[in-house]
């Protein structure tokens, strides 16, 4: 190839690169969005410690293991552990184990009990070297210490980096908890956060095995119903990105669900690592600037499968059935 041809080839290559840069290459904003999406995909709710053994202690002793705030309305009663801010004690007041009215139905229990079944909410961050609240964090009660309809409870925790975390928890007259998670930044740094929620169950319950009745992990994602049996999740995990919906664990008569904040994209995961887990994490970060604040809402429904109640939530809370 002579010198003229070499120069022509180089010129043509340069022209192609320039044209691509002008018309096809992603803009700085698009690159930032792509990086954020990549970060979100690599972020996930906190890993369960697969080496953690289920400690065979009584439910009563497990309840006593941490300080608690009590909650009660016309349908449910129980408590929230201040260690982790976990909903792990829930009893149905109007349903009993036997026809003679003995022993109210207990659904949620602490993780140290063999039949542990509980709900956690919180934050993860793509920012390194930041202390975050976790399942062992001891939350402080600010003000009112009993949760009831029209009587919220505020929990707070501060790290040593100038970041203050809050959970403002409300309950309605039936089965709905609303958790507003807030973070205030008193430092001179900025951080990215992703809100998450997860339902964890130590063991699968006794299954009815009635072919038209699903018991296991369940969700509706962008109007698509997903049902996964306990045995199926042991063999293969499930993951799906969505912009609307809910997820949870369902029994024959009871259901525990998480509802991510409306109009926020999230990824849902069902998995088993010594425990069953249904969780979601928002896939777009909230940036917490210096002297700023951010918030995210998670709704939790822990309910008896009463048709009227479920229909009411579906209609008034925009929850897909």
Protein language model regions, located:
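Aromatic/His-enriched, Gly/Pro-containing loop or helix-boundary segments
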Residues: 1, 40, 142-144
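Soluble non-transmembrane domains of integral membrane proteins
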Residues: 72-75, 79-320
């Amino acid at each position: 190839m002579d010198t003229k041809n070499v120069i022509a080839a180089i010129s043509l290559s340069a022209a192609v690169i320039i044209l691509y840069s002008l018309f096809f290459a992603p803009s700085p904003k698009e690159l930032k969005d792509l990086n954020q999406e990549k970060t979100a995909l690599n972020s996930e709710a906190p890993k369960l410690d697969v080496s953690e053994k289920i400690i065979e202690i009584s439910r009563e002793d497990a309840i006593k293991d941490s300080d608690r705030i009590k909650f009660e309305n016309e349908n449910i009663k129980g408590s929230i552990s201040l260690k982790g801010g976990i909903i792990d004690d829930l009893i149905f007041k109007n349903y009993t184990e036997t026809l003679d009215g003995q022993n109210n139905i207990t659904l949620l229990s602490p993780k140290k009990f063999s039949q542990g079944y509980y709900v956690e909410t919180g934050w993860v961050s793509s920012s390194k070297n930041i202390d975050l609240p976790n399942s062992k964090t001891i939350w402080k009660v600010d003000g009112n210490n009993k949760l009831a309809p029209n009587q919220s409870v505020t929990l707070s925790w501060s790290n040593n980096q100038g970041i203050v975390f809050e959970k403002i928890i409300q309950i309605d007259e039936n089965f709905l908890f609303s958790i507003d998670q807030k973070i205030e930044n008193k430092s001179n740094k900025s951080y990215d956060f992703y809100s998450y929620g997860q339902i964890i169950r130590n063991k699968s319950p006794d299954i009815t095995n009635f072919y038209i009745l699903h018991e296991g992990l369940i969700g509706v994602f962008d109007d698509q119903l997903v049902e996964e049996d306990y045995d199926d999740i042991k063999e293969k995990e499930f993951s799906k990105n969505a912009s609307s919906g809910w997820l949870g664990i369902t029994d024959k008569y009871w259901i525990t669900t998480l509802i991510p904040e409306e109009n926020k994209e999230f990824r849902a995961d069902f998995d088993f690592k010594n425990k069953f887990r249904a969780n979601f994490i928002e896939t777009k970060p909230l940036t917490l600037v210096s002297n700023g604040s951010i918030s995210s809402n998670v709704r939790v429904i822990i309910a008896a499968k009463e048709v009227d109640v479920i229909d009411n939530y579906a209609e008034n809370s925009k929850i897909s059935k």
